[in-house]
């Protein structure tokens, strides 16, 4: 029997029983239970806080690449908070799921809805409003009022100099729209439409909002400036190697990798919603390697850290290539690799060797024309050597087969019975025509980066009258991989430090031990062999933002191509910098570029545009030949970068606007008055210098941009490299530029140099935003935008296969409007004013020679023919830009903006070279939306709401409309002769609508708009269609390229990947040498601006939650060693100064940082905790105050193969990683 222990006695029992009289509640008989009622009033607050009336699906349009679906909670008409959606479709068994997706930044967005930074009403610059109202009262016409202000230099300078100094006043939507419309009408009437520009980046992050504004700009004949290249997020190597902008795997494909490298991409920070795939791949057994100069957040996830000095990654990749070529191609041959490069790369193709003085140097591809073939497009059909027959043959699939009747059914990678020989060494030496020759190659591994040469032997043979070798032969010579019997300077082994591209050579440059580089290369290759190419490299801004990023990327891509990893699930490259992938591509570009109403659109590379119009070119005092190869032809001798930009514009390689030194509308009138064909008239006038390209005199007031609209962007506070030059020259307000244009440097020969440098080119800068930023603060008109929780829109990304919706959880509060509604108001006001001042005009539109068109064959061999230099009469579309005459009915802009135009019925829609015809879709849209019943748009489908525009974008895109996907593949089948339509068959009746995206995340359809397959739920990987279905790459050979044969690439010595160190800022720009300054108070360091943990670009960096989680305000990360040199302790105020500007911030001293490098995270705006400087007493700048735009000539190459312009496909990058700055400790007493 169990005895219950008894504690206490009668006294205790008495106390227990008495206690019930003093304790609230009801007691049980045994006193063991007390029941209390009430007292929970405090819970009401908690329950009320988390109660809500409805939940709405939306996402964030912040260019974070996440495109995460969120639940937005609303109570009493107020947005209260957000949480992650959890209804993503399953990716299948045996792999992790996509959900939940999100990050702390996204989870804090609702703070913005009611924050102090919210733009609630339309604003305009007070002094300008006063001028405008007075002039309008006096003249009675908005356009005349605007013209009156611009005609008075004193009044114009008054409001320009007020930019950024406060003084914004509330105005009505009607007055703001009228003022903006008047500025547009006046500019078009006086100067021409190409003096109007729009800047809005990353359409994938909110397609409707982007298209609404871009559509207006293009309909009036204005210019859309690019962003992908301007941000330096575009890896120019992608068009150079693949002929593709950037197509990359979704993050779910990382799971399939068995060797995963993060090279210049800090995945946990910049790809937070997707980082779990990286960790899970490692748990699955993949080895994870990180290449970075600092101990970054992703380093702690890695199995191995390869600590490579900043900006020297090319040297490491070249050394790894040396090992892979030695181990897998020369000492042994890995059949998997050899078979791959024979079919899918240009390694077997023949290169002509040419004499240059006493030297033998690599030249251009041997083509069918060189060996006497007279077939169509013979000059664009490169040749190779058939190993079986020992004869030179012309394989199918090259550019010459892509266009023209002879190529129908032959543009494919089917080699038939041909076995491409990788080397002429495989030749059987018929008639003794095989021998070896010394070829001279460039090298740039000196400290200052100037070129030297190395001579190495290659096996050669004759092909007709030409001495040739293969690309592979040149690769081995260039990488320093010796073969028996070949003369020249060769490494004695991996540990030879004296010869370029060996592991020991790279150690002295990168700091990576030679043994580690050798093991890294061997592991990478061995894994590819054993796994069938499942070696993957995630790449990003860490190596993409450098001046020489193209060769840096090409050297890394070479590793993937040599190991057969491209075009494989779980293998290849994975470049992520920016939310670039507009999955419904065709529909978006039709809407955004207004090609349903007028063609072609005006598009310009952003870096070229801002380089010229912010006068940053004037501060470049070095000759372009400083970058040239020692074995070049001297094409850049004595030329300034601006001369090369002028030549590229003249030859039609790269566009620039404005076009002419007078209005393009007036030029059309002149040609008509002369009774001449417009093309002939323009060419003749240009040759006689009676008409000039504006690029030859960009500082002449007639050639200035006059009106700039910025929306969905923060140009001045985020992406404006050389921000202080924007302020000084474009906007005409105060700046902190610390230098003057050099007087003793190289000045342009073909561009007017005037000692009077303009300040204040723009008549109007207008921005649309939901929060106050550095851009809105300098704008003349600020329109209040709806946030991402207050409008209808679409989002997609590279990272996952879904299309997401934005949905309005509430109506836009105060006087805010969606971008769609804002541009509707502006277009309506514009058309009303145009009735009196513009009417219908004829416009002459110049457009660069385009990628994915026959324009790629304009310049055989990529040989420049500069009519500006020779005095010849240019030929439009051949030796200069294409010329198109466009009729613009300016009175009907609003009606056209609001409807789907007839050109898609007439000409179809072309994407990446194939055309589809959406007759059925147009009829369906007309039936669903109704049609316009009057005016020029009568009978056309009405797009009167943002929801409707979203549905149009989806309906016109193969990724969201299975019928168009199948039609596109059938069209490609005719040209390729390969079966492709099966990739989308079964989807013919499938449609994705805006309502579908509101219901849940919707995966897209496999479409020829992109290079990978998603059929059957497959994880998306790029180029799988090329590899598995023999569709050629969009390049000269139809294969992936190691070798580039364009004149301007050759002049730089970059036909093959080559190590080029960071720019020598001391030699080229007279900046201080790295290290302590002469006075010992400062330290010159390399200045890098990586992406931030606490913001996406400038969004969230001013968010109260993120300011609380981070250090808050402007900061600079530096190493303890560097900090000690200038007596800086953690959290001290420091000041950074260089020729471009001044930056004031607090120091974060951390052991994770290498010496000689500082990080200022992108973006830290001037709107948070930015004090005055000690240098000049003005307020300090932002992270871009210390940067400046520099143009690399090879990025301007055009008119030949994959080197041809397309918007955001190819253009100079706004690189900024080569900068240096002097940092010093400043007074800790800061003033604001």
Swiss-Prot record:
Disruption phenotype: Loss of nitrate reductase activity in aerobic and hypoxic conditions. [4Fe-4S] cluster binds at residues 60, 64, 68, 103. It catalyses: nitrate + a quinol = a quinone + nitrite + H2O. Its EC number is 1.7.5.1. One of its GO terms (molecular function) is molybdopterin cofactor binding. Gene3D superfamilies: 3.40.50.12440. It is an enzyme of class 1 (oxidoreductase). The modification N-acetylthreonine is found at residue 2. It is found in: Cell membrane. Mo-bis(molybdopterin guanine dinucleotide) binds at residue 233. Binds 1 [4Fe-4S] cluster per subunit. Induction: Constitutively expressed; independent of nitrate and nitrate levels. InterPro entries: Asp_de-COase-like_dom_sf, MopB_CT_Nitrate-R-NarG-like, MoPterin_dinucl-bd_dom, Mopterin_OxRdtase, Mopterin_OxRdtase_4Fe-4S_dom, Mopterin_OxRdtase_prok_CS, MopterinOxRdtase_cofactor_BS, NarG. Increased nitrate reductase activity is seen under hypoxic conditions, however this seems to be due to induction of the probable nitrate/nitrite transporter narK2 rather than increased enzyme activity. GO terms for cellular component: extracellular region; membrane; nitrate reductase complex; peptidoglycan-based cell wall; plasma membrane. Keywords: 4Fe-4S, Acetylation, Cell membrane, Electron transport, Iron, Iron-sulfur, Membrane, Metal-binding, Molybdenum, Nitrate assimilation, Oxidoreductase, Transport. One of the activities induced in M.tuberculosis by hypoxia is the dissimilatory reduction of nitrate to nitrite, which serves to provide energy as the bacteria adapt to anaerobiosis. Belongs to the prokaryotic molybdopterin-containing oxidoreductase family. The alpha chain is the actual site of nitrate reduction. Supports anaerobic growth of E.coli on glycerol in an E.coli mutant lacking endogenous nitrate reductase. This is Nitrate reductase alpha subunit. It comes from Mycobacterium tuberculosis (strain ATCC 25618 / H37Rv).
């Amino acid at each position: 029997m169990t005895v219950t222990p008894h504690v206490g006695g009668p006294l205790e029992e008495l106390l227990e029983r008495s206690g019930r009289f003093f304790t609230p509640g009801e007691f049980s008989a045994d006193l063991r239970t007390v029941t209390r009622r009430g007292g929970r009033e405090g819970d009401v607050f908690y329950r009320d806080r988390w109660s809500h009336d409805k939940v709405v699906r939306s996402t964030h349009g912040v260019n974070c690449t996440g495109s995460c679906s969120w639940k937005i909670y609303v109570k009493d008409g107020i947005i209260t908070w957000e949480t992650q959606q959890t209804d993503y479709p399953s990716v299948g068994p045996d792999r992790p799921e996509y959900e939940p997706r999100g990050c702390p930044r996204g989870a804090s967005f609702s703070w913005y809805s009611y924050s102090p930074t919210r733009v609630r009403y339309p604003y305009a610059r007070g002094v300008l409003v006063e001028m405008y109202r007075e002039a309008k009262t006096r003249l009675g016409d908005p356009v005349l009022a605007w013209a009156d202000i611009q005609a008075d230099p004193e009044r114009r300078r008054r409001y320009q100099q007020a930019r950024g100094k406060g003084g914004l006043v509330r105005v009505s939507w009607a007055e703001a729209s009228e003022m903006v419309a008047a500025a547009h009408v006046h500019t078009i009437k006086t100067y021409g439409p190409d003096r109007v520009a729009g800047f809005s980046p990353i359409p994938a992050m909110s397609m409707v909002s982007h298209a609404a504004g871009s559509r207006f700009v293009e309909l009036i004949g204005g210019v859309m400036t690019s962003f992908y290249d301007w941000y330096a997020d575009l890896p120019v190597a992608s068009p150079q190697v693949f002929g593709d902008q950037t197509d990359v795997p979704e993050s779910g494909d990382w799971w399939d990798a068995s060797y995963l490298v993060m090279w210049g991409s800090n995945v946990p920070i910049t790809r937070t919603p997707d980082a779990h795939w990286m960790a899970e791949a490692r748990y699955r057994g993949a080895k994870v390697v990180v290449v970075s100069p600092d101990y970054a957040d992703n380093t702690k996830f890695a199995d191995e850290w390869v600590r490579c000095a900043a900006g020297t990654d090319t040297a490491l990749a070249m050394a790894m290539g040396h090992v892979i070529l030695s181990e897998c191609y020369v000492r042994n041959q890995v059949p998997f690799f050899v078979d791959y490069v024979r079919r899918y790369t240009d390694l077997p193709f023949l290169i002509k060797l040419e004499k240059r003085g006493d030297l033998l140097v690599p030249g251009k591809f041997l083509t069918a024309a060189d060996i006497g073939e007279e077939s169509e497009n013979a000059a664009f059909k490169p040749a190779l050597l058939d190993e079986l027959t020992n004869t030179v043959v012309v394989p199918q699939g090259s550019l010459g087969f892509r266009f023209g009747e002879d190529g129908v059914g032959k543009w494919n990678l089917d080699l038939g019975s041909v076995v491409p020989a990788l080397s002429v060494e495989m030749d059987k030496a018929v008639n003794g025509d095989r021998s070896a020759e010394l070829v001279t190659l460039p090298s740039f591994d000196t400290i200052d980066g100037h070129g030297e040469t190395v001579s190495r032997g290659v096996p050669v043979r004759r092909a007709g009258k030409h001495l040739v070798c293969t690309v592979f032969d040149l690769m081995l010579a260039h990488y320093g991989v010796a073969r028996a019997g070949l003369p020249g300077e060769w490494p004695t082994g991996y540990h030879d430090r004296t010869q370029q591209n060996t592991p020991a050579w790279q150690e002295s440059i990168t700091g990576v031990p030679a043994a580690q580089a050798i093991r890294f290369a061997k592991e990478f290759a061995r894994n590819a062999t054993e796994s069938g190419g499942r070696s993957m490299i995630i790449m990003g801004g860490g190596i993409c933002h450098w001046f020489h990023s193209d060769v840096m990327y090409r050297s890394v891509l070479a590793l993937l191509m040599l190991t057969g990893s491209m075009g494989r699930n779980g293998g290849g490259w994975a470049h992520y910098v920016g939310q670039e992938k507009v999955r419904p591509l065709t529909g978006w570009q039709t809407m955004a570029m207004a090609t349903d109403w007028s063609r072609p659109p005006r598009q310009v590379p952003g870096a070229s545009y801002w380089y010229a119009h912010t006068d940053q070119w004037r501060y470049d005092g070095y000759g372009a030949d400083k970058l040239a190869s020692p074995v070049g032809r001297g094409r850049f001798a004595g030329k300034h970068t601006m001369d090369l930009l002028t030549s590229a514009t003249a030859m039609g390689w790269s566009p620039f606007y404005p076009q002419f030194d007078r209005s393009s509308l007036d030029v059309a009138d002149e040609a008509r008055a002369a009774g001449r064909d417009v093309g002939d008239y323009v060419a003749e006038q240009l040759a006689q210098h009676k008409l000039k390209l504006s690029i030859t005199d960009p500082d002449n007031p007639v050639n200035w941009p006059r009106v700039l609209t910025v929306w969905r962007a923060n140009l001045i506070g985020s992406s404006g490299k050389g921000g202080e030059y924007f302020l000084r020259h474009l906007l005409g307000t105060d700046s902190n530029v610390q230098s003057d244009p050099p007087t003793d440097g190289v000045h342009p020969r073909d561009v007017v140099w005037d000692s009077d440098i303009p300040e204040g080119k723009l008549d109007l800068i207008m921005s649309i935003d939901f929060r106050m930023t550095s851009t809105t603060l300098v704008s003349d008109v600020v329109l209040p935008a709806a946030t991402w929780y207050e409008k209808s829109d679409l989002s997609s990304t590279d990272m996952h296969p879904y299309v997401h919706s934005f949905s309005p959880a509430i109506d836009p509060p105060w006087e805010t409007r969606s971008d769609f509604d804002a541009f509707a108001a502006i277009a309506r006001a514009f058309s009303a004013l145009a009735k009196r001042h513009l009417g219908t005009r004829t416009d002459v539109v110049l457009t660069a020679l385009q990628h994915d068109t026959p324009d790629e064959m304009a310049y055989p061999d990529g040989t420049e023919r500069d009519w500006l230099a020779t005095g010849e009469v240019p030929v439009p579309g051949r030796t200069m830009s294409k010329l198109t005459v466009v009729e613009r009915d300016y009175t009907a802009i609003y009606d056209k903006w609001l409807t789907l135009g007839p050109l898609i019925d007439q000409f179809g829609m072309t994407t990446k070279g194939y055309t589809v015809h959406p007759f059925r879709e147009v009829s369906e849209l007309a039936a669903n939306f109704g049609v316009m019943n009057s005016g020029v748009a009568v009978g056309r489908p009405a797009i009167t709401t943002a929801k409707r525009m979203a549905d149009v974008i989806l309906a016109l895109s193969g990724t969201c409309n299975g019928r168009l996907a199948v039609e596109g593949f059938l069209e490609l089948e005719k040209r390729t002769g390969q079966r492709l339509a099966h990739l989308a068959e079964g989807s013919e009746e499938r449609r994705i609508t805006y309502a579908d995206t509101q219901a849940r995340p919707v995966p897209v359809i496999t479409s020829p708009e992109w290079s990978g397959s998603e059929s059957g739920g497959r994880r998306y990987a790029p180029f799988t269609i090329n590899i598995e279905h023999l569709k050629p790459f969009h390049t000269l050979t139809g294969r992936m390229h190691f070798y580039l044969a364009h004149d301007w690439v050759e002049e730089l010595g970059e036909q093959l990947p080559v190590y080029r160190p960071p720019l020598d800022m001391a030699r080229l720009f007279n900046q201080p040498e790295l290290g302590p300054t002469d006075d010992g108070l400062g330290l010159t360091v390399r200045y890098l601006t990586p992406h931030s943990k606490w913001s996406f670009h400038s969004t969230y960096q001013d968010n109260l939650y993120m300011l609380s989680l981070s250090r808050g305000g402007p900061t600079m990360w530096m190493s303890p060693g560097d900090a000690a040199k200038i007596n800086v302790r953690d959290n001290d105020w420091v000041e950074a100064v260089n020729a471009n500007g001044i930056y004031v911030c607090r120091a974060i001293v951390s052991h994770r940082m290498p010496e000689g490098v500082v990080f200022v995270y992108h973006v830290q705006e001037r709107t948070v905790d930015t004090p005055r400087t000690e240098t000049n007493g003005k307020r300090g700048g932002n992270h871009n105050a210390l940067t400046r735009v520099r143009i690399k000539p090879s990025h301007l190459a055009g008119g030949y193969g994959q080197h041809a312009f397309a918007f955001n496909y190819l253009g100079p990058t706004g690189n900024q990683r080569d900068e240096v700055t002097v940092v010093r400790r400043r007074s800790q007493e800061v003033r604001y």
